[in-house]
Amino acid sequence: MQELQYDVVLLQKIVYRNRNQHRLSVWWRHVRMLLRRLKQSLDGNEKAKIAILEQLPKSYFYFTNLIAHGQYPALGLVLLGILARVWFVMGGIEYEAKIQSEIVFSQKEQKKLELQSQDDIDTGTVVARDELLATEPISLSINPASTSYEKLTVSSPNSFLKNQDESLFLSSSPITVSQGTKRKSKNSNSTVKKKKKRARKGRDEIDDIFG
C-alpha cells in the first residue's frame, strides 16, 4: 500500500488548489472521498479498501465526463491516471472477477430454486385422446321404482340419458281409473236405493189403495 503514497500526495495538492472552485460539483465529491479513503487504507483500515474498490467505477464515470465535455481535460486525465493505479495496486481485477463469479453463482442457484418450485407444483397427468377412445364402456345398474335391477351399457353421456328416460317411461305402472269409478258408481247406487226406501216409508194406506 505504500506504493500509493505518491498518489495521495498528488490528490492532496489537487484538493488544496481547487477546493473553492469545484466544491459544489458532483465529481469533486468523488475526489475528496477518494483522498479520505486512501488515507484510511494506508493506516491499515481494510474496510476502507473495500469501499474504494466499490467507489472506483462511479468515480471513473464522473472523471471521464470531464474529458468528454472538454471542461477540464487535463485535470480529468490526472484523476483517471490515479484511479488506474489505485485499481491495479488494490487488486481491482481480482475483485471484479470475484464479483462476476458470485453473480453467476447466484443466477445458477436462482434457476435451481425455480426448477424445484416448478417440480413441486402438481399439474396432473397428460391423457391422450386415443387413450380415452380406447377405454371400455362403463356398465351401470339402475333400480327403477317398480321394476327389478336392469343393466344398461353406456357408451356416451347422451345415450345414457336417453336409455334412462326410456327405461323409466316403460317401467312406470299405468294409471287405473276403474277402481275410482267403481267406487263412485257403488256410492251413487246406494244413495238411490236409500231414497227409494225413504219414499216407500212415507206412503200411507190410501196411497197403497190407489196405487
UniProtKB/Swiss-Prot annotation:
Keywords associated with the record: Membrane, Nucleus, Phosphoprotein, rRNA processing, Transmembrane, Transmembrane helix
A molecular function (GO) term: rRNA primary transcript binding
Residue spans of biased composition, Basic residues class: 181-201
Membrane topology listed for this record: Single-pass membrane protein
Compartment(s) where it occurs, according to its Swiss-Prot or TrEMBL record: Membrane; Nucleus, Nucleolus
Region of interest (Disordered), ranges: 178-211
Intrachain S-S bonds: none
Gene Ontology CC terms: membrane; nucleolus; nucleus; ribonuclease MRP complex
InterPro entries attached to this UniProt entry: RMP1, RMP1_RBD
Major subcellular location class: membrane
Residues that span the membrane, as ranges: 73-93
Pfam families registered for this protein in UniProt: RMP1
CDD domains in the record: RMP1_RBD
Phosphoserine modified-residue sites: 156
GO biological process: one example: maturation of 5.8S rRNA from tricistronic rRNA transcript (SSU-rRNA, 5.8S rRNA, LSU-rRNA)
Entry function: Functions as part of ribonuclease MRP (RNase MRP), which is involved in rRNA processing in mitochondria.
Subunit text: Component of RNase MRP complex which consists of an RNA moiety and at least 10 protein subunits.
Protein name: Ribonuclease MRP protein subunit rmp1
Organism name: Schizosaccharomyces pombe (strain 972 / ATCC 24843) (Fission yeast)
Organism placement in taxonomy: Eukaryota, Fungi, Dikarya, Ascomycota, Taphrinomycotina
